[in-house]
Structure formats: structure tokens, C-alpha cells
UniProtKB/Swiss-Prot annotation:
Keywords: Acyltransferase, Glycoprotein, Membrane, Transferase, Transmembrane, Transmembrane helix. This is Acetyltransferase cdmC. One of its GO terms (molecular function) is acyltransferase activity. It comes from Talaromyces verruculosus. Compounds in the chrodrimanin family such as chrodrimanin A or verruculide A exhibit strong inhibitory activities against protein tyrosine phosphatase 1B (PTP1B) and therefore, they could potentially be developed into drugs for the treatment of type 2 diabetes or obesity. Furthermore, chrodrimanin B, the end product of the pathway involving chrodrimanin A or verruculide A, does not exhibit the PTP1B inhibitory activity, while it functions as a potent blocker of insect GABA-gated chloride channels.
Length: 417
């Protein structure tokens, strides 16, 4: 079979991008050429997956490489499933060539569909800070300053999280995260549950800020040079206060980068192929299952790139466990609403519901997160940030800087800390 050398990887990546831009800009919705491109895109992604770099040296390189399967699914979505049509505007007029190429390029980099008719729901709004505060700086440059300050603060949080992992002695690492410890739930003692809780908290805090770094920096640069506007960059993640159910954890708090694409693929299976009734229980939970299967595949590819030999089963079960979690959650909510409908609408009832929900989500993540991350934590070496501030200033000073930074960001920039 035809095989491309590893040195041609930039050619593969650029060919994929140019092909999708060309098809979006020059072909109509449901064009035969779009469907004929699917085998070509499949061949390209196969080559990308089987010919990764020999060494994945840092977090950003790992993130780019692990997103290869998602990029493929996203391209299939915008070309064939959602089938974006850039050759017609709302008035049936053919837009200019430059506008179509620009829109095609943006759709590739905009998996949340921000500013389009396909924008996913529950994306956080642009902060009110930009409307309330006025001064000698324009809205654009206030946005740039705020984003850069948040970038530095979040970078420091990620640096602290990575350093806590790097500085752990190998003997202690093996004792805490050794093979099989992620599955020790029933017989786990208080110390093991404490480790599970701390590992989950540190991981989710680090990951939450890590996924935001490129968004903060990219938005600051592009808006600073005038290529984009403030309102094209809603926050990547929502408020932790909304994460009182498992559905809200993914649908409101976490980033929505995968939602449009994976939902389009799952709807294709359930509605077009199986022709299940919309909003039926079977369609709903089968959609959930398909989305999480795709998500598991994407993240397992990331663990493969990281060189984790035992990192396949855990991440897969972690994502699939949420389907069972949704079933339990929906059943309990239905029973609660049926028995205590009037009482649950009071402010006290809502507070109790959300407090109980937060405890439920925290417990679920404490149980399941180690399935995903313990294989990673067992590694002696990990990806490094380009520059470690913790190595320069020390852990205690870094933690103090995070605390002071949080106060400044909250009071000066009205940031959602």
C-alpha cells in the first residue's frame, strides 16, 4: 500500500487543511466531491496516526498530535454531516471568493461554531467586564491585557500541577499510583481515598487551566492585531458552580470543543442510519454512548502518543462510565422531582439540590478519574512546559503568586476564578 515517509508530515497536514478549505469554498452542500474526499481524508489521518513524531517533547506538541483523530471527525462533520454551504448567504447570493475562503478557514479552527448558526449551546457569554469598564484603553486592548494576565496566571497553575507530579520520588510514585491501584475501590483505605481525591483535584485543576492556555494567548494576539474582535472569543470554559450534575460538568463547565462534531456523528448513527425517534430514551442514551466512545478513542490516542503501555482500558472505561452515571443521575432527578416538586423550587430546595449534586459529581470523579490518569502518573518522566517558573521561584513562592494573582484578577478584571 502507498506509504509516505515521516519527513512528509508537514505536507500531509497542509494538504488536509487546503483540501477542506477548497471543498468548503468551491463546492455546494451535498456535493459529490465532498463525499469523494472522505477516502482521501481517511488515508491522510491514517498516515498521521501511524507516523507520529519519534519523540513528543512537550505538552503543546502532545496536544496537537493527540487532536489528529478529532480533526478528521470535524472535517467529516463540516463537509458531509452538517455540510456547511458557503456558496449561499441568507439572501441566496453567492458571496465573494475571499469571503468564502476566509469562512472556510475559520470553520476549520472553530469547532464550537462560535458566531455561526451552528454555535453549540451553553457557551459562556463574553464577560460583562468589557461593557462595564471604561477608561483610556479601548475595549480591544483591555481584552488583550486581561487575556494576557489570565494566561500568565493559568500558566503558573499548570506549572505548579506539573511540578507536583515531576518532583514526586519514584518510590512514592509507585506506592501511590502503582499498577492496579486505580481499580482498588472496595478495599481502599482512608489513605488511598485521600490520594484518589487529591489526584483528581490536582488533575482537573491543572487540565482546566491547560486547555485554556492556547485560547487565551491566541485570542490576545489575533485581537491585538485587529484580525478578530472581542466578541469572537467567548470563554473556553464555564463556571464551576454549574458543575452540580455530570451533564453540566461536560455541557456547561468543561470546554465545548468536541460537542458539535461528536454530536453530529452520533446523530448520524441514531437518526439517519437507525432512524430512532427523536427525544426517545433509546435515542438519547445511545447518543450519549456514541459520543463518549468517540471521546474515549480521541483521548486513548493521546495516551498512546505519551508512550503509556497500559493506558487504553482505563481511559475507555472512564468515558463510558458517564453513560451509566447519566442513567443514575436522570433516574434520581426524576424521582426527586416527582416526590418533592413544590419543595424543590424554593431557594432552600435549590441550594440543597445543588449541594447534593456537587457531592455526587465529586464522588463520581474521585472514583473514576484514577482509571484515566493513574497510568499517566506512573510515568517517571512527563511533558514539560517550555519554561518552568516554579523551578525559578520555588513552589511556595509560586503558590503565593497564584493567590495574589487570583485576588488581582478578581478585583481588577472581574475574572471568574
Amino acid at each position: 500500500m502507498l506509504s509516505l515517509e515521516p519527513l512528509s508530515r508537514p505536507v500531509l497536514d497542509s494538504s488536509q487543511t487546503l483540501l477542506v478549505i477548497f471543498l468548503l469554498a468551491f463546492t455546494r452542500q451535498n456535493s459529490i466531491f465532498r463525499y469523494l474526499s472522505i477516502p482521501v481524508l481517511t488515508f491522510i489521518v491514517k498516515e498521521q496516526i501511524t507516523q507520529p513524531p519519534a519523540v513528543v517533547e512537550n505538552f503543546h506538541q502532545w496536544l496537537n498530535e493527540s487532536s489528529v483523530p478529532f480533526n478528521y471527525l470535524h472535517h467529516i462533520n463540516i463537509l458531509a454531516l452538517t455540510s456547511i454551504d458557503l456558496r449561499n448567504d441568507n439572501n441566496g447570493v453567492l458571496p465573494g471568493l475571499f469571503d468564502r475562503i476566509k469562512s472556510a478557514f475559520i470553520y476549520q479552527l472553530n469547532p464550537r461554531g462560535v458566531g455561526t448558526r451552528y454555535q453549540v449551546k451553553n457557551i459562556p457569554p463574553v464577560p460583562e467586564y468589557y461593557k462595564k469598564r471604561k477608561g483610556y484603553l479601548s475595549q480591544r486592548y483591555r481584552f488583550v491585557v486581561r487575556q494576557l494576565c489570565l494566561f500568565v496566571w493559568q500558566y503558573l497553575i499548570v506549572d505548579v500541577g506539573c511540578s507536583l507530579w515531576h518532583n514526586l520520588p519514584d518510590q512514592e510514585r509507585f506506592a501511590l499510583f502503582g499498577p492496579g491501584t486505580e481499580w482498588n475501590i472496595i478495599n481502599a483505605g482512608p489513605q488511598q481515598w485521600k490520594v484518589r481525591l487529591m489526584a483528581a483535584m490536582i488533575f482537573w485543576t491543572t487540565a482546566r487551566n491547560a486547555v485554556d492556555l492556547s485560547h487565551r494567548l491566541g485570542s490576545a494576539v489575533l485581537t491585538g492585531i485587529g484580525a478578530t474582535s472581542v466578541h469572537e472569543w467567548p470563554p473556553m470554559c464555564g463556571s464551576l458552580r454549574d458543575a452540580y450534575t455530570l451533564r453540566n460538568l461536560w455541557g456547561k463547565w468543561w470546554h465545548q470543543q468536541l460537542r458539535w462534531t461528536l454530536s453530529s456523528h452520533s446523530n448520524f448513527v441514531t437518526r439517519r442510519l437507525l432512524k430512532l425517534p427523536r427525544r426517545s430514551l433509546l435515542e438519547r442514551y445511545l447518543n450519549n454512548a456514541i459520543v463518549h466512545v468517540f471521546s474515549a478513542f480521541i483521548h486513548v490516542n493521546g495516551w498512546r502518543l505519551a508512550g503509556i503501555p497500559d493506558g487504553y482500558i482505563g481511559p475507555s472505561l472512564f468515558y463510558m462510565s458517564f453513560v451509566g452515571g447519566y442513567l443514575v443521575e436522570d433516574f434520581v432527578q426524576h424521582i426527586w422531582a416527582t416526590l418533592f416538586r413544590s419543595r424543590s423550587r424554593t431557594s432552600t430546595g435549590i441550594f440543597f439540590e445543588r449541594l447534593t449534586g456537587i457531592f455526587w459529581v465529586a464522588t463520581f470523579l474521585t472514583v473514576t478519574t484514577p482509571w484515566w490518569i493513574y497510568p499517566l502518573l506512573r510515568r517517571e518522566h512527563s511533558f514539560a512546559l517550555p519554561v518552568s517558573l516554579v523551578e525559578s521561584v520555588g513552589m511556595n513562592n509560586a503558590l503565593a503568586m497564584i493567590g495574589v494573582g487570583a485576588f488581582i484578577l478578581k478585583t481588577r478584571f472581574d475574572a471568574n476564578i
